[in-house]
Amino acid sequence: MIETDKLRAAAPERLISPQPADRQEDAVERALRPKRLAEYVGQAKIREQLEIFIHAAKKRSEALDHVLLFGPPGLGKTTLAHIVAAEMGVNLRQTSGPVLERAGDLAALLTNLEPHDVLFIDEIHRLSPVVEEILYPALEDFQIDIMIGEGPAARSVKLDLPPFTLVGATTRAGMLTNPLRDRFGIVSRLEFYTPDELGFIVSRSARLLNVEIDDDGALEIARRARGTPRIANRLLRRVRDYAEVKAGGHITRAVADAALRMLDVDSLGLDLMDRKMLSAMLEKFGGGPVGLDNLAAAIGESTDTIEDVIEPYLIQQGYLQRTPRGRMATHSIWQHFGLAPPRPGGTDLFGG
């Protein structure tokens, strides 16, 4: 099973990775994070739904129903969890699935919640089965059963919990068990952002960072950010560095383009690793089909890195196909590299 920490290790220096790079980047993200739904850009349908559900829960003086947020990394699941707590006017307690190793870890969190508080569990698909078992009655009945004592003297004690809201986030909704998934009343999938939406996010972040940027400059960064706010904000900070040294601190479209070309991020948001693999497919294997092991050997990367770090975005964008015979480049990527795709059926012996 490929998890977040493994993905970070596989590509620690990729500028266009949707995973947070380090604690310093986490701190910057927190500073740039919108605090209210009114400030949140994109995900219009989810935003509207949450606004209605939160307003209704507050009107009835109830805890919001449990919320499951899923989708690719870097799209704002953690941000939405913080916004839910802020809009409800309650505290947020944050943890992650791998941290909750024992039932007692979860019990300690739950028993310290105030009424209507939000408990946010990131990577909730990584909860251990024993912790999940404790969570089920907590979500349904706001009660937990804990064992006191050991051996023959051990006894089960039922503890009442204040009504609370669990917000779970995952990049792998399919790995959630059915009983856990069924206990969420609100289930929302986050989608990739449009360039226009990311342009607004880049402009807002630039204001918070005191960076001068034109609308065209913001859009140029947005177009190369792979539909992901985390990547857009990271690119903005690197373009800011370039602009301060080379352009008097002002980001125009030309400055953004020059900075991103220097950083090896092209007009499709592909970086050196992406282009290395795609060019090998086109030039060494005629566009495929090519087996994963051959492709890994050709570019000097592991098969895990190709499958879990490089491929997902290329497949999602339609630049690469997985077939029973191997990987194949699509027509659009031949065009991007300025090459003519081979004609079906091979060479015409009669020149027709």
Curated annotation (Swiss-Prot):
Enzyme class: hydrolase
Signal peptide coordinates: none
Positions of region (Large ATPase domain (RuvB-L)): 4-193
Binding site for ATP: L32, R33, G74, K77, T78, T79, E140, D141, F142, R183, Y193, R230
Stretch list, region Disordered: 1-26
Gene3D superfamilies assigned: 1.10.8.60, P-loop containing nucleotide triphosphate hydrolases, Winged helix-like DNA-binding domain superfamily/Winged helix DNA-binding domain
CDD domains from the UniProt entry: AAA
Compartment(s) of residence: Cytoplasm
Annotated region (Head domain (RuvB-H)), positions in chain: 267-352
One GO term (biological process): DNA repair
Keyword Cytoplasm: yes
Small ATPAse domain (RuvB-S): region residues: 194-264
InterPro entries the UniProt entry points to: AAA+_ATPase, AAA_lid_4, DNA_helicase_Holl-junc_RuvB, P-loop_NTPase, RuvB-like_N, RuvB_C, WH-like_DNA-bd_sf, WH_DNA-bd_sf
Protein family according to the UniProt entry: Belongs to the RuvB family.
Recorded domain comment: Has 3 domains, the large (RuvB-L) and small ATPase (RuvB-S) domains and the C-terminal head (RuvB-H) domain. The head domain binds DNA, while the ATPase domains jointly bind ATP, ADP or are empty depending on the state of the subunit in the translocation cycle. During a single DNA translocation step the structure of each domain remains the same, but their relative positions change.
Quaternary structure (record): Homohexamer. Forms an RuvA(8)-RuvB(12)-Holliday junction (HJ) complex. HJ DNA is sandwiched between 2 RuvA tetramers; dsDNA enters through RuvA and exits via RuvB. An RuvB hexamer assembles on each DNA strand where it exits the tetramer. Each RuvB hexamer is contacted by two RuvA subunits (via domain III) on 2 adjacent RuvB subunits; this complex drives branch migration. In the full resolvosome a probable DNA-RuvA(4)-RuvB(12)-RuvC(2) complex forms which resolves the HJ.
Task performed by this protein: The RuvA-RuvB-RuvC complex processes Holliday junction (HJ) DNA during genetic recombination and DNA repair, while the RuvA-RuvB complex plays an important role in the rescue of blocked DNA replication forks via replication fork reversal (RFR). RuvA specifically binds to HJ cruciform DNA, conferring on it an open structure. The RuvB hexamer acts as an ATP-dependent pump, pulling dsDNA into and through the RuvAB complex. RuvB forms 2 homohexamers on either side of HJ DNA bound by 1 or 2 RuvA tetramers; 4 subunits per hexamer contact DNA at a time.
Protein name: Holliday junction branch migration complex subunit RuvB
Record organism: Azoarcus sp. (strain BH72)
